[in-house]
Swiss-Prot record:
Signal peptide: none annotated. The lineage of its organism: Eukaryota, Metazoa, Chordata, Craniata, Vertebrata. One of its GO terms (biological process) is regulation of transcription by RNA polymerase II. GO terms for cellular component: chromatin; nucleus. This is Vertnin. It comes from Sus scrofa (Pig). Keywords: Developmental protein, DNA-binding, Nucleus, Transcription, Transcription regulation. It is found in: Nucleus. Acts as a transcription factor that regulates development of thoracic vertebrae. GO terms for molecular function: sequence-specific DNA binding. InterPro entries: Trp_repressor/repl_initiator, Vertnin-like, VRTN_OTU_dom.
Length: 698
């Protein structure tokens, strides 16, 4: 036994002893020591001594499973050993025998331990790999495997790493990714034409984590026991070599074999072209020979040459951006578009944010420093020399995030429409992510009540109240008021911005239709979703005195002017708002805001009707409804409020029951049952359920 083999065995023994300790701390410490030992000698470029050339034997079981879309003129070979034979197959492909399988196993364990975050979350293909890990536990796609949480996958990863320290253990998909990084080569993972639903996650080219040169490609096949014409059970890996290499090996048995001449990675366009080489094939022909489902056949048929070329270009562009990021910086947009003009700007920025958020490179330093800056430092950062910090986009995003956190710290929730008016470049999803994080950091936050006296003028006042000034802006406005300050730049316009012309026109049109009495409440909510329900009832309460108030406005118009008319209208709406608030305040205990525990869930599944909710609300009162506003309008107001409350409670109960039964509905299904509930409300309730909150008690 050579000194190299003794060192490898010693490293494996130390790793096996560290496995017995709880957690991964001891194993990570042993991996750091093993890395120092293994870095003292590199992997050989060819076989050094050892036994003579072995007789190559074709694996008949793997050959019967060899797929049609795999590279031609290649044969799977028999590999001797125990377990899944992944490291033995790689050693045989590179050095002609399995002598270095233990060293490859040790190096792979070190790679997986020291770069655990990368393989679970950091790389571009991490979602595909994790999905493949879910399906590797079964022979076909199932809902149980699809819904495995990330914590379970991390536990499986840790268990697989510990098991890899021992010979004869079985390997998984992330072992292929780690082995590709250890060997600095691409691995062509060949998967049989079985288990068609999960095959795309396994039949793919796996690239190393980092590589400074154009890597060669190893071909390794998933082999095992065929169950039916459609299914097979994976048992081991088989090395795949070209026919020329087999002939050269048998022709030069007296000479020491050299490493096989590995073929370069085929371009993505050629790889995708193998799926549908003959577009004239019929479904019946493919169904008889390859057991292809009808949906898969028509999906392949729709993939034209142009579509495959676009997919190949996108594939190459994504990996080009990843390689440039690992070399120390992201390629600028103009340079990227010159190389890949087919890729859109939004796609480029999406990939860029994905790479910056992975946390696997030192390029995140400027972003982390920017997160720690205060508002004044962000303003001073505009003159910074670093392009990552001084770019306008980064400064704008940091300003928007700090502004939202500042408003929430002042117990004020900024609506998205007001936030977007101030920061038009921030998407809705980014806004809600920032708002959720800010709310978690402020547990004492208490939102304002929905029904208030000033609710009548909500569309005109929400935007003005929500846009609170910054600390620096307060000083600027004070200086401007005293006459000693400089005029504010365009970013710091006065915060009390008037509504745009189309919003005013929309509001006037809605008011006119409500006052005319031809617009019911349900149609008002569908036609004007941006206006609050309290606004409708304020206008509805003014409908009785509309001619008298209109004549009064016409009489006062010559003396008051336009501003006076608006003040009179606001005064009337405020007075009506007080009446509406009094009408919507029934005795204590009469309104039930949550669904009862014994409520039949079938009613929620079928979509609750408005009439049923009204009848239940009236029965709960036990007496005729009498509104403070008087007359039919006040009664309709209270009945509609009861219906809205019951409707929202049933929607919450429906989502909570479906969440508990692990069959959460999509927004399309939910909106079919509850059409008046906004999309943002659905996602807010969904996020609350997944965060562990309860929507309805009982």
């Amino acid at each position: 036994m050579t000194s190299r083999e003794q060192l490898v065995l010693q490293v494996l023994q130390e790793l096996q002893e560290a496995v017995e300790s709880e957690g991964l701390e001891g194993l990570v410490g042993a991996a750091l020591e093993a890395k120092q030992v293994l870095s003292s000698f590199a992997l050989p470029t060819c076989r050094e001594g050892g036994p003579g050339p072995q007789v190559l034997e074709v694996d008949s079981v793997a050959l019967s499973l060899y797929p049609e879309d795999a590279p031609r003129n290649m044969l799977p070979l028999v590999c001797k050993g125990e377990g899944s034979l992944l490291f033995e197959a790689a050693s045989m492909l590179l050095w002609g025998d399995s002598g270095l399988s233990l060293e490859l196993r040790a190096r792979t364990v070190v790679e997986m331990l020291l770069h655990r975050h990368y393989y679970l979350q950091g790389m571009i293909d991490s979602k595909v790999m994790l999905q493949a890990v879910r399906y590797s536990l079964c022979s076909e796609e199932s809902p149980e495997m699809t819904s495995l949480p990330s914590a379970t996958l991390e536990a499986i990863f840790d268990a697989d790493v510990k098991a890899t320290c021992f010979p004869s253990s079985f390997s998984n998909v992330w072992h292929l990714y780690a082995l590709a990084s250890v060997l600095q080569r691409n691995i062509y993972s060949i998967y049989p034409m079985r288990n068609l639903k999960i095959r795309p996650y396994f039949n793919r080219v796996i690239r190393p984590r980092r590589c400074d040169h154009m890597p060669a490609t190893l071909h390794i096949m998933w082999a095992g026991q065929p169950l039916t014409n459609h299914l097979f059970r994976h048992q081991y890996f088989a090395p795949v070599v070209g026919l020329e290499e087999v002939e050269a090996e048998s022709a030069t048995t007296s000479l020491a074999p050299t490493p096989p001449a590995l073929a370069p990675l085929p371009p993505p366009a050629k790889t995708l072209e193998l799926l549908s080489q003959d577009p004239g094939l019929s479904y019946s022909y493919l169904c008889e020979r390859y057991s292809v489902t009808k949906s898969t056949f028509y999906r392949w048929r729709r993939q034209s040459q142009e579509h495959r070329q676009k997919v190949a270009t996108r594939f190459s562009a994504k990996h080009f951006l990843q390689d440039s990021f690992h070399r120390g910086g992201v390629v600028p947009l103009q340079q990227f578009l010159q190389r890949f003009p087919e890729i859109s700007r939004s796609t480029y920025y999406a990939w860029k944010h994905e790479l910056l958020g992975s946390g696997t490179c030192q390029a995140l330093g400027p972003m982390e420093e920017l997160e720690k800056l205060t508002e004044e430092q962000v303003a001073e950062g505009l003159g910074c020399s670093s392009p990552a910090v001084s770019s306008p986009g980064m400064v704008l995003m940091q300003r928007a995030k700090l502004y939202l956190e500042h408003c929430i710290s002042l117990n004020t929730l900024v609506p998205y429409r007001c936030f977007k008016r101030r920061f038009p470049g921030i998407s809705r999803s980014t806004y809600y992510n920032w708002r959720r994080k800010a709310l978690r950091r402020n547990p004492s936050f208490k939102p304002a009540p929905v029904l208030s006296v000033a609710g009548a003028t909500q569309p005109a006042s929400v935007g003005e109240k929500a846009l609170l000034p910054w600390e620096g802006e307060v000083g600027e406005e004070a200086g401007k008021a005293t006459g000693g300050g400089q005029p504010a730049p365009r970013e710091f316009l006065p915060l009390r911005m008037p509504l745009s012309r189309w919003q005013r026109r929309l509001r006037r049109e809605a008011r006119k239709q409500v006052l005319s009495g031809h617009l019911p409440f349900c149609r008002f909510r569908l036609r004007y979703p941006s206006l609050s329900p309290s606004t409708f009832w304020v206008w509805k309460s003014l409908a009785r005195g509309w001619p008298r108030s209109l004549s009064k406005l016409h009489i006062q118009a010559p003396t008051l002017g336009k501003g006076g008319i608006q003040e009179v209208e606001e005064k009337q709406e405020k007075e009506a708002g007080r009446n509406v608030t009094a009408a919507m305040a029934p005795p204590a205990g009469t309104l039930q805001m949550t669904a009862s525990p014994g409520e039949d869930p079938g009613a929620a599944l079928g979509g609750p009707s408005r009439e049923g909710a009204l009848q239940e609300g009236a029965m709960a009162q036990g007496r005729p409804m009498v509104a403070a506003a008087g007359g039919r309008d006040g009664q309709v107001l209270v009945m509609d409020m009861l219906a809205t409350t019951k409707f929202k409670a049933q929607a919450k109960l429906f989502l909570q029951k479906r969440f508990q039964s692990k069959s959460f509905p999509s927004y399309k299904e939910f909106s079919a049952l509850f059409p008046l509930t906004a999309r943002s409300t659905y996602y807010m309730w969904k996020r609350a359920l997944y965060d562990g909150l309860t929507l309805v008690d009982g």
